[in-house]
A protein has these predicted regions:
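PP2C/PPM-type serine/threonine phosphatase catalytic domain
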Residues: 1-182
Length: 182
């Protein structure tokens, strides 16, 4: 039996909470509006609503469906921004999962993360789409330097920013007792 819990808090740093999530059966999603831009809250709400509507209309949900749902939300947001100039620059991250038996399908864009907690170890599944992650991967900065780097909040991919969106996705085998964190 799977138990799902959702919680979103504003925290101590931000003045507004731009996080949104949904849980529907075996499907979960988290979006986080880009706080430095206009419309981050609108983008995250719109994206989570579009993703939910897309996925809950399907009979079964697999890895490609998760990618397609994010791409669908991206197109809807891009189209909305084209009609409402005041929303220019808005965007959001997205991480979406679906559990099918012992398989965890996932898709992500941005820096909202997916983790699997097993046997006392927390393992990050997704890779951030951020400038500091690219610098780390290139060996130009260390993990410690990521935390204070001036570009630590700069995303290299986000939902709703460009017409064409590359979505990362994968499949993880899960075991009884695993905890999935988005």
């Amino acid at each position: 039996m799977n138990n799902f819990v959702g919680l979103s808090k504003i925290g101590l740093v931000r003045q507004r909470n731009e996080d949104r999530f949904f849980i529907d059966g075996h499907i979960c999603a988290v979006t986080d509006g880009m706080g430095g831009y206009s419309g981050g809250e609108i983008a995250s709400t719109y994206a989570v609503d579009e993703i939910k509507e897309y996925l809950t209309s399907l009979e079964t949900v697999g890895q490609q469906d998760l990618c397609d749902a994010i791409i669908h939300a991206n197109q809807r947001i891009v189209n909305r921004v084209a009609c409402e100039e005041r929303l220019a620059g808005m965007g959001t991250t997205a991480v979406v999962t679906a559990i099918n038996g012992d398989q965890l399908y996932w898709a992500s864009v941005g820096d909202s993360r997916l983790y699997v907690y097993r046997d006392g170890l927390l393992r990050q599944i997704t890779t951030d789409h951020s400038m500091v992650q690219e610098l780390l991967t290139a060996g130009e900065i260390t993990k410690d330097e990521m935390l204070s780097h001036p570009q630590r909040n700069l995303l290299t991919r986000a939902v709703g920013v460009d017409q064409i969106l590359e979505v990362d996705s994968g499949v993880e085998s899960i075991l009884p007792g695993d905890r999935i964190l988005l």
